[in-house]
């Protein structure tokens, strides 16, 4: 993102925000409520249109592309809300995602088994979506997001509504995705969990990036502690 701006009525909620996510890098976009982080995130996703600035994937601008076209060029979005089909099994949920990306025949079955094994969901492959725990659902959702072999994944509140053990599992999955060369952008209200996995973080307030750096740099920033983390924050 380069110099992105967004105004709703008379209020400028995002004011000249720039940040980048590289291949094989996990980046966090954080900040207090009303900071503009969610609007900035949604402009990358394609849910909100910027008033000014540009959004690029590599050297190509994707600012004018709708969500489905962004997915085709390698940008996968995982929303906070449940995105699996509750009345389909885990196996069927993944198959639907593969078919949506035009994968069929033997290749579809082979990719299905690869994803089931990679995300350790073989024991629940015949379980219905409505019967999954929060952590299991997240695993299946990420498996579905990988159906199209994306270059980048956008994770909206990936740690919301799951227990501590599941948080550690999701963090490990994110590390594996990073090791595969996939770039990942995370926005989440669970600050400690997010800073525990990202390589770099941007902290927003009043529509602008106020602090940026590694997890350690952000966690020890006096400015970030003053307006967001609190004086007693520890990683």
Language-model segment annotations:
Residues 149:
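Conserved catalytic motifs of ABC-family nucleotide-binding domains
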Residues 153-157:
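Catalytic Walker B motif of ABC-type/P-loop ATPase nucleotide-binding domains
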Residues 45:
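Helix-to-loop junction immediately C-terminal to a conserved catalytic motif
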Residues 128-132, 136:
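Conserved ABC ATPase signature
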Residues 30-32:
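The feature captures the beta-strand-to-loop junction immediately N-terminal to the Walker
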Residues 95, 106-124, 171-175, 223:
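Conserved ABC ATPase "signature" region
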């Amino acid at each position: 993102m380069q110099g992105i701006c967004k105004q709703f009525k008379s209020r400028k909620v995002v004011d000249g925000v720039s940040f980048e996510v590289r291949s094989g890098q996990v980046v966090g976009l954080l900040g207090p409520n009303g900071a503009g982080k969610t609007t900035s995130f949604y402009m990358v996703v394609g849910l909100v249109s910027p008033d000014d600035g540009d959004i690029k994937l590599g050297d190509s601008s994707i600012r004018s592309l709708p969500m489905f076209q962004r997915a085709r060029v390698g940008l996968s979005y995982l929303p906070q809300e449940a995105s699996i089909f509750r009345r389909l099994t885990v196996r069927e949920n993944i198959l639907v995602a593969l078919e949506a990306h035009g994968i069929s025949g033997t290749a579809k079955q082979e990719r299905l088994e690869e994803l089931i094994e990679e995300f350790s969901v073989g024991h629940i492959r015949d379980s219905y979506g409505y019967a999954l725990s929060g952590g299991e659902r997240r695993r299946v959702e990420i498996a579905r997001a990988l159906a199209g072999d994306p270059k980048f994944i956008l994770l909206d509140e990936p740690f919301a509504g799951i227990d501590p053990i599941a948080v550690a599992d999701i963090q490990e999955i994110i590390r594996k995705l990073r090791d595969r060369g996939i770039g990942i952008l995370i926005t989440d209200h669970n600050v400690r969990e997010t800073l525990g996995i990202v390589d770099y973080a941007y902290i927003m307030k009043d529509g602008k990036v106020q602090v940026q750096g590694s997890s350690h740099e952000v966690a020890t920033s006096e400015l970030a502690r003053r307006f967001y983390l609190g004086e007693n924050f520890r990683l």
